[in-house]
Amino acid sequence: MRVIPQFGDTCLQQLKNIDIQKWIFSLQKASPRTGKPLSPKTIKNILLNLSAAMKKAVMLELIPKNPCDDLTLPKLEHYQPKVYSMEEVETLLQCARNTALYLPLMIEICLGLRRGKLLALRWHHVDFQTGCLTVEENLVTVNNQTITKAPKTQSGRREIQIPGTLLRLLKGTKAERHAGQNDYIVCQEDGSPYKSDSFSMKFRRFLKANDLKHIRFHDLRHINATIMLSLGISPKVAQERLGHSSYQITMDIYSHVLKKVEQEAADKLDAALFEQNPA
């Protein structure tokens, strides 16, 4: 969307590295429309799409070299997830009760799905007999259209056991839905799926309206993982439920939580062995 207004009238053979570099620098300045610069991640994604097109042009021998090579990009900012305490989670759910956000928040806190996976859920993904949820689709927005896609990796498709309280909530919600509505579990009033950005905006407005600590919707996934590991649930089980492609990814992301759990285990072992008979 940003590339065409900038370079749409430029002849392919005349597009130079220096032109793209100047454009990158301009994207890092405050936008007249929003008053804010684009994030480094957004700029990187824009350049990835442009570079892919230029790479194709090189393959077709339309240009000799990819003008997107050797560009200086802004450094990506490492985001530190914000985690709610159990008391804050309870307050969040209390504020959301009787609102359209209650069900998606319950799903997210109990299952820790990525946003696109959550929004792609349909009723046929829930097996009410076994209490199992099948995660196999991802909802994305392409050219302002909402579509579902298959996961990129095998670990992205998985089956998760649903906690009893959430399963009962899902049953009750399904019974209340009007016949003929779209099959999406998390949906707008007319039954249509949310666009990812508009859903995140709805969540941010909810937090602000209820004077709750600001977190990203994705942070709820980290909250789910932190709760699991703090309860002593095996990191391997957490990996499978979260859909991480490897055990090491789970260990790397949540090493700080695991250190705390390990210390608690050491303290319990110490108490069990030596509280009555100190060494």
Q: What is the meaning of each model-derived region?
A:
Residues 75, 83, 139, 167, ...:
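Catalytic-site neighborhood detector that most strongly recognizes the C-terminal catalytic loop/helix
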Residues 31-36, 90, 94-101, 111, ...:
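Short, basic (Lys/Arg/His-rich) helix/loop patches that form interaction surfaces
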Residues 94, 130, 143-157, 161-168, ...:
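C-terminal secondary-structure termini that scaffold catalytic or DNA-interacting sites
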Residues 36-40, 44-46, 59-121, 128-129, ...:
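Basic, Lys/Arg- and aromatic-enriched nucleic-acid-binding interface segment
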Residues 2, 10-25, 29-70, 114-116:
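N-terminal DNA-binding recognition helix of tyrosine site-specific recombinases/integrases
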Residues 125-132, 233-253:
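Short, polar N-cap/turn motifs at the start of nucleic acid-interacting alpha helices
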Residues 1-21, 59, 172-185, 192, ...:
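N-terminal DNA-binding module of tyrosine recombinases/phage integrases
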